[in-house]
């Protein structure tokens, strides 16, 4: 929808597409968080967690915090692609899946290995990564709006 509006050079439709796309994404992710937080045992059963059930439930509760920001990041990526921002989309993807998460999980694991923190600290790498990527994504969105959307006649 946003790409179509961009092709039409319709600022209002682009802005509406971004606005409603993000609103729907946030609403859906909040529902996902609620379901995961309320019924983590059901997910453990789905994945046949067995003896690792408690670890699985703990991990799901921490990781579900990242759902909201992950959803926003995926929406940002779609917005960037629709507005000819493939590089920005790629950067967010790399931040989320490689550049932030791997070093952060490695650093967190050092604290766990040294006995300073529990195993759940490693799972916090997911929400922290998503929040950082979301902040970078917001900066990219402002830049794209300024340079591509607001310049439309």
PLM features per residue range, with description:
Residues 25, 60-63, 67, 93-94, ...:
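Residue-level recognition of transmembrane alpha-helices
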Residues 31-53, 57:
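Short membrane-interface helical motifs at transmembrane helix boundaries
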Residues 36, 78, 104-109, 137-141:
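Structural signal for membrane-spanning alpha-helices in multi-pass inner-membrane proteins
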Residues 51-76:
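Alpha-helical transmembrane segments of multi-pass membrane proteins
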């Amino acid at each position: 929808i946003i790409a179509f509006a961009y092709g039409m050079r319709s600022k209002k439709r682009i802005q509406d597409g971004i606005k409603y796309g993000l609103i729907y994404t946030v609403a859906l992710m909040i529902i996902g968080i609620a379901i995961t937080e309320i019924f983590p045992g059901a997910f453990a059963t789905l994945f046949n967690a067995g003896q690792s059930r408690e670890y699985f439930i703990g991990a799901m509760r921490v990781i579900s915090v990242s759902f909201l920001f992950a959803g926003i990041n995926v929406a940002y990526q779609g917005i960037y692609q629709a507005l000819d921002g493939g590089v920005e989309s790629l950067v967010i993807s790399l931040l989320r899946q490689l550049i932030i998460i791997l070093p952060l999980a490695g650093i967190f694991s050092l604290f766990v290995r040294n006995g300073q923190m529990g195993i759940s600290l490693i799972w916090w790498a997911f929400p922290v990564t998503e929040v950082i990527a979301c902040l970078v994504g917001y900066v990219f969105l402002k830049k794209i709006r300024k340079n591509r959307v607001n310049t439309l006649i």
